[in-house]
């Protein structure tokens, strides 16, 4: 039986909030079977918990925010992507502010931290959401589409008419597995345009943004001295974002995902469209690990 996963032990770290610019503590704690992914605001008294649920998502500026009444946890997509990449089902994430720390702008640091906690199998079957028929979400010329597929394939295309974005590197496809995610996707950093930064900071946004946690792009190209980690790092990061956004449905999805200029809002709308009709999907488990179309890292 393919089993649910959590961590063996608590892992603690800290980083800078992308928008606040303040230090944020983040702790990863084991969670119970079928507990799902839960964010806990420990800076509040009493602490407030918010389930990682697509129906609680509100988009802020270029990030996904979980909102429960007047409490939010923002910039969750990179840590959610790492959790999905390792196949973790149940986890409590404590944060000391209203946003998850940005780390280096990728999911790589979160992969490292989670592995320090050691993956632990639980005595319950791992659940998957299998898409049974095509579902789409459209906004203007942007689109996000699920079609039935034996596995989890992500095809993504961005469209930037800019010297930094070579045409041949604006599309990418991956067949999702832990190995592919860790080595080919998790290190791809978020990116932004330098011309937007002054405006954002004037509006108390992106106060923590720097070339240590993002790829900066000016009128001619990439500003970072080290350049890109991958020739197609921009589109790989959009895949990273999509993996995190789509994991907010509560379980790993079995389907093909096609995104064209899709962002957090459209990815979330796609999940809502799936959930609007129960005939769009079914919950499946695998008694034999060999029958699972998605390969995860082995748990010792």
Swiss-Prot record:
Required co-factors: Zn(2+)
Binding site for Zn(2+): 78, 237, 241
Database matches in SUPFAM superfamilies: Ribosomal protein S5 domain 2-like
EC number: 3.5.1.108
Pathway: Glycolipid biosynthesis; lipid IV(A) biosynthesis; lipid IV(A) from (3R)-3-hydroxytetradecanoyl-[acyl-carrier-protein] and UDP-N-acetyl-alpha-D-glucosamine: step 2/6
MF terms (GO), sorted A to Z: metal ion binding; UDP-3-O-acyl-N-acetylglucosamine deacetylase activity
Key words of the record: Hydrolase, Lipid A biosynthesis, Lipid biosynthesis, Lipid metabolism, Metal-binding, Zinc
InterPro entries recorded: Ribosomal_Su5_D2-typ_SF, UDP-acyl_GlcNac_deAcase, UDP-acyl_GlcNac_deAcase_C, UDP-acyl_N-AcGlcN_deAcase_N
One GO-annotated biological process of the protein: lipid A biosynthetic process
Active site: 264 (proton donor)
GO cellular component: membrane
Catalysis: reaction(s): a UDP-3-O-[(3R)-3-hydroxyacyl]-N-acetyl-alpha-D-glucosamine + H2O = a UDP-3-O-[(3R)-3-hydroxyacyl]-alpha-D-glucosamine + acetate
Family as reported in the entry's similarity comment: Belongs to the LpxC family.
Role according to the record: Catalyzes the hydrolysis of UDP-3-O-myristoyl-N-acetylglucosamine to form UDP-3-O-myristoylglucosamine and acetate, the committed step in lipid A biosynthesis.
Name recorded for this polypeptide: UDP-3-O-acyl-N-acetylglucosamine deacetylase
Gene of this entry: lpxC
């Amino acid at each position: 039986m393919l089993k649910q996963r959590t961590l063996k032990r608590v892992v603690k770290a800290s980083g800078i909030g992308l928008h606040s610019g303040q230090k944020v503590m983040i702790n990863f704690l084991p969670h119970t079977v079928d507990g799902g992914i839960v964010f806990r605001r420990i800076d509040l008294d009493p602490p407030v918990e918010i389930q990682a649920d697509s129906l609680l998502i509100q988009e802020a500026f270029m990030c996904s925010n979980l909102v429960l009444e007047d409490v939010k946890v923002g910039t969750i997509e990179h840590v959610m992507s790492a959790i999905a990449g390792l196949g973790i089902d149940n986890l409590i994430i404590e944060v000391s502010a209203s946003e998850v720390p940005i780390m280096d702008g990728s999911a790589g640091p979160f992969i490292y931290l989670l592995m320090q906690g050691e993956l632990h199998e639980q005595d319950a079957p791992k659940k998957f959401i299998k898409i049974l028929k095509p579902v789409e979400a459209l906004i203007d010329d942007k689109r996000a589409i699920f079609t039935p597929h034996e596995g989890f394939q992500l095809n993504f295309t961005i469209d930037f008419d800019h010297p930094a974005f070579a045409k041949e590197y604006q599309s990418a496809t991956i067949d999702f597995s832990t190995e592919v995610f860790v080595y080919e996707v998790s290190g791809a950093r978020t990116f932004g345009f330098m011309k937007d930064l002054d405006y954002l900071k004037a509006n108390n946004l992106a106060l923590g943004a720097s070339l240590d946690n993002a790829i900066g792009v000016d009128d001619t190209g990439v500003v970072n001295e080290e350049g890109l980690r991958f020739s197609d790092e921009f589109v790989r990061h959009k895949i990273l974002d999509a993996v995190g956004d789509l994991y907010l449905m509560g379980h790993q999805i079995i389907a093909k995902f096609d995104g064209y200029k899709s962002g957090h809002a459209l990815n979330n709308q796609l999940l809502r469209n799936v959930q609007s009709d129960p005939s769009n999907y079914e919950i499946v488990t695998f008694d034999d690990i060999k029958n699972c179309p998605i390969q995860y890292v082995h748990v010792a």
